[in-house]
């Protein structure tokens, strides 16, 4: 399993992670999605954004805005998601999966503990890229 995500660093320990994709095999077809509470303990594999043109081309299918993608490590929850999908697909192992599972989170703060995630969310808020003005707000300005 490969883990790809957008990431914005807040400080040495904290950051925002969203649009997390779990890729299995060589396929980039979406095989499912899950909604989770907050990004967990997965860690950045490389501090440099992904630069492989083939990977970037495929990742762009899954993005709303043009931002860098990073590779992260898999965490325990991601492994459980893979096992659940393999089971529901009638496969004997997550290694037999082929495609992409999208993870959507309620919080974007990378923090495995929900209470700490809530606290950090209150402290940091959201970066401007997550702020979408409504039609009403646009008309007022």
Regions of interest found by a model, annotated:
Residues 34, 38, 105, 141:
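Glycine-rich anion-binding loop/nest that anchors nucleotide
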Residues 111-141:
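Glycine/proline-rich loop-helix segments at beta-alpha junctions forming the active-site rim
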Residues 59-97:
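Acidic, metal/cofactor-coordinating or nucleic-acid-engaging core segments within structured domains
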Residues 73, 77-84, 102, 128-138:
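Amphipathic alpha-helical interface surfaces
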Residues 1-69:
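Active-site and ligand/interface coordination hotspots across diverse enzymes
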Residues 89, 95-117:
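Short connector loops at secondary-structure junctions
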Residues 24-29, 95-96, 137-141:
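Flexible, charged surface loops at secondary-structure boundaries
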């Amino acid at each position: 399993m490969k883990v790809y995500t957008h990431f914005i660093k807040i400080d040495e320990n904290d950051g925002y992670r969203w649009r997390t994709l779990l890729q299995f095999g060589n396929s980039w077809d979406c095989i499912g999605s899950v909604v989770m509470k907050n990004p967990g303990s997965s860690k950045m594999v490389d501090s440099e954004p992904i630069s492989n043109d083939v990977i970037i081309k495929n990742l762009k299918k899954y993005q709303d805005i043009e931002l860098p993608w990073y590779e992260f490590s898999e965490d325990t929850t991601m492994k459980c998601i893979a096992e659940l999908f393999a089971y529901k697909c009638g496969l004997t192992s997550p290694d037999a999966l082929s495609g992409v599972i999208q993870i959507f989170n309620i919080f974007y703060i990378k923090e495995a503990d929900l209470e700490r995630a809530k606290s950090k969310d209150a402290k940091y808020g959201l970066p401007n890229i997550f702020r979408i003005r409504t039609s009403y707000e646009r008309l007022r300005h």
